[in-house]
C-alpha cells in the first residue's frame, strides 16, 4: 500500500509540473457572415499553413465540422442565441442535437468547448436568465450521458458590458442588473471547472475616447504605466487592466478559482470616418502581434503574473455581410482569396518587428537609435535603467561584467544600450525613447567594438549581444522542451514502477 501511495504521489507531482509549464494558447475566430469565403476544406488548409491550432466557430455547421476532421486542430463550437430557447426547454432536444449534430464528427474532429449563447446579455431578443443557464445545464447533461463531460467543456461568452466598473482594476464589479443571471452561471462554471469566457476589445475604448486613452496603451506599446491606487499594481496595457478587472469582480463574488478565457479580441483594418484614426492595418498588426507574444510568453497580468491564458483573435476573414459600421466588416486577418491582410506569426516566436507607421506616436525607423540624454540626472538614469531591466522586459545580460557592452563601465553607457534595446523592441516609437526625459533619439549608430546596438530593421543575427530580442521568442520553445522532458520522465517512472509492482506480485 505504501509503495502504491508513493507511485500515485510521484505521478501527481509530475502531472502538476507538466500543467505548470504549459503556455497560453492563441486561436482564431472563424466567422462566416460573408458570401465570398472559401470552402471549409480550403479554410482548414489555410489554417494549417499558418500553424493555427485552436479555432472558434459560432455554430455547429456539418460541413465545417467535417472539414476539421483528422487535423488535430482543437475546435470550439457554438450554440447560437437563436437556439437557446429550444435548448433550455427540453433535455430530449439537446440529447438529439448532440447525437445528430456533434457525435458523428467526434472525436475525429477534436471538439473541446461548446459555447451556449454568445454575448447573450447584449442581445435584446434573449432573456439570459431564462435561457442561457438551463441550456448550459442541458448540454452538460447530454455530454454526461455519453461520457464526454470532462473532455468537452461547456460555457457561454460575454462582453465587457457585464461589468459596471472596470477601472481601477481592483474595483472591478459586475453589473448588478445581471445578478440574477450571473450567480447561477458562475456556480455552473465553478462546479464544472469551465472557464469564464469574455470578448475583450481595447480598440473600442480608444475609438470612443481617443483624447483620454493613449493609443500606445491599448497597443501594448506604452513606456509609461497606469497605477491602480488600491493595490499599487502597474499596468502597461489596457488588455491586462480589463482582464484583472474581471478577476477582481469574480473574487468579489467569491469565485476565485474560475479561469478567464478571452474568446474574442482583435483590431479592425478599416473603418468609417469616425473610426479612421483608430482602424488601420498598422494598428491591427501591432495589436495582434503584441497580444500573441504576450500570451505565448506567459506574462500574465499584474494581478496574476505568469498565469497562462487562452486567447482567440477575431477574425479569420473580413465578413462582408455583417451589419453596422465599416469596421464590422474589416476585422479579418485574411482576404477571401486567402491572401494575408497583414503578416502575423501565430506562434509568437518571430523576432520580426511590426512598425506602427500610421500611429501618431510612431516616427521610428531602422536609422534611429535611443541613448541616454546627457542632460538627464544620475537618479533619473538609474531609475529608468532599473525599470527597463525589470518591468520593461529588456534582457540586460550584455551590460554585465565580461559581456560585450560592460565597458565602459558607466551609468550613461549602460543606460544607452538598455534604452535602445527597449526602444527597438517597442517599434521604435517616440514614446518608447522618452524614459521621462532621460532618453534621446539619435541618427548615428552608437555601436562600438563588439557591442552592437540593434535596430528594428537591422540584421539581428549579427548582433552578438542581441539576446533581448530573442528572449521572449525562446520561451515557448523552452516550455515545449521542458514539457517533452517531463513527459519522458513520467513514462519512465510509470514503466519502472509497474515493473516493480509486477515483480512483487509474482
Curated annotation (Swiss-Prot):
Enzyme Commission no: 3.2.1.39
Listed GO CC annotations: extracellular region; plasma membrane; plastid; side of membrane
Family matches, as InterPro entries: Glyco_hydro_17, Glyco_hydro_17_plant, Glycoside_hydrolase_SF, X8
Molecular function GO terms recorded: glucan endo-1,3-beta-D-glucosidase activity
Main localization, broad class: secreted
Disulfide bonds: 370-433
PTM notes: Contains two additional disulfide bonds.
SMART domains linked to this entry: X8
Signal sequence bounds: 1-22
Protein name: Glucan endo-1,3-beta-glucosidase 13
Amino acid at each position: 500500500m505504501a509503495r502504491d501511495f508513493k507511485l500515485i504521489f510521484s505521478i501527481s507531482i509530475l502531472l502538476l509540473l507538466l500543467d505548470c509549464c504549459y503556455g497560453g494558447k492563441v486561436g482564431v475566430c472563424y466567422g462566416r457572415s460573408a458570401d465570398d469565403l472559401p470552402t471549409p476544406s480550403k479554410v482548414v488548409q489555410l489554417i494549417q499553413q499558418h500553424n493555427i491550432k485552436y479555432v472558434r466557430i459560432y455554430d455547429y455547421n456539418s460541413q465545417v465540422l467535417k472539414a476539421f476532421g483528422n487535423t488535430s486542430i482543437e475546435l470550439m463550437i457554438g450554440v447560437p442565441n437563436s437556439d437557446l430557447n429550444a435548448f433550455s426547454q427540453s433535455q430530449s432536444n439537446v440529447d438529439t442535437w448532440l447525437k445528430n449534430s456533434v457525435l458523428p464528427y467526434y472525436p475525429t474532429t477534436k471538439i473541446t468547448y461548446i459555447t451556449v449563447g454568445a454575448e447573450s446579455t447584449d442581445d435584446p431578443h434573449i432573456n439570459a436568465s431564462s435561457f442561457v443557464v438551463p441550456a448550459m445545464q442541458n448540454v452538460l447533461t447530454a455530454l454526461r450521458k455519453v461520457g464526454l463531460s470532462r473532455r468537452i467543456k461547456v460555457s457561454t461568452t460575454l462582453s465587457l458590458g457585464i461589468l459596471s466598473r472596470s477601472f481601477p482594476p481592483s474595483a472591478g464589479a459586475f453589473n448588478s442588473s445581471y445578478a440574477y443571471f450571473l450567480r447561477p452561471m458562475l456556480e455552473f462554471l465553478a462546479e464544472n471547472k469551465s472557464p469564464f469566457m469574455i470578448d475583450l476589445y481595447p480598440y473600442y475604448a480608444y475609438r470612443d475616447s481617443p483624447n483620454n486613452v493613449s493609443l500606445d496603451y491599448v497597443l501594448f506599446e506604452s513606456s509609461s504605466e497606469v497605477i491602480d491606487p488600491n493595490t499599487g499594481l502597474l499596468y502597461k496595457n489596457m488588455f491586462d487592466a480589463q482582464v484583472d478587472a474581471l478577476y477582481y469582480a469574480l473574487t468579489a463574488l467569491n469565485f476565485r478559482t474560475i479561469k478567464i478565457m478571452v474568446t474574442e479580441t482583435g483590431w479592425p483594418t478599416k473603418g468609417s470616418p469616425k473610426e479612421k484614426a483608430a482602424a488601420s492595418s498598422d494598428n491591427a498588426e501591432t495589436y495582434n502581434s503584441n497580444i500573441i507574444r504576450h500570451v505565448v510568453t506567459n506574462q500574465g497580468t499584474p494581478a496574476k503574473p505568469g498565469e497562462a491564458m487562452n486567447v482567440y483573435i477575431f477574425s479569420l476573414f473580413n465578413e462582408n455581410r455583417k451589419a453596422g459600421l465599416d469596421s464590422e466588416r474589416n476585422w479579418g486577418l485574411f482576404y477571401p482569396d486567402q491572401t494575408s491582410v497583414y503578416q502575423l506569426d501565430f506562434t509568437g516566436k518571430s523576432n520580426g518587428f511590426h512598425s506602427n507607421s500610421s500611429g501618431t506616436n510612431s516616427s521610428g525607423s531602422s536609422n534611429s537609435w535611443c541613448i541616454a540624454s546627457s542632460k538627464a540626472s544620475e537618479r533619473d538614469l538609474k531609475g529608468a535603467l532599473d525599470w527597463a531591466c525589470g518591468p520593461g522586459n529588456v534582457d540586460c545580460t550584455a551590460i554585465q561584467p565580461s559581456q560585450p557592452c560592460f565597458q565602459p563601465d558607466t551609468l550613461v553607457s549602460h543606460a544607452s544600450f538598455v534604452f535602445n534595446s527597449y526602444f527597438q523592441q517597442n517599434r521604435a516609437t517616440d514614446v518608447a525613447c522618452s524614459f521621462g526625459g532621460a532618453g534621446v533619439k539619435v541618427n548615428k549608430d552608437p555601436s562600438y567594438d563588439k557591442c552592437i546596438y540593434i535596430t528594428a530593421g537591422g540584421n539581428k543575427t549579427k548582433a552578438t549581444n542581441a539576446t533581448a530580442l530573442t528572449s521572449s521568442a525562446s520561451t515557448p520553445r523552452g516550455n515545449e522542451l521542458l514539457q517533452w522532458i517531463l513527459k519522458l520522465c513520467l513514462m519512465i517512472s510509470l514503466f519502472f514502477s509497474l515493473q516493480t509492482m509486477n515483480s512483487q506480485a509474482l
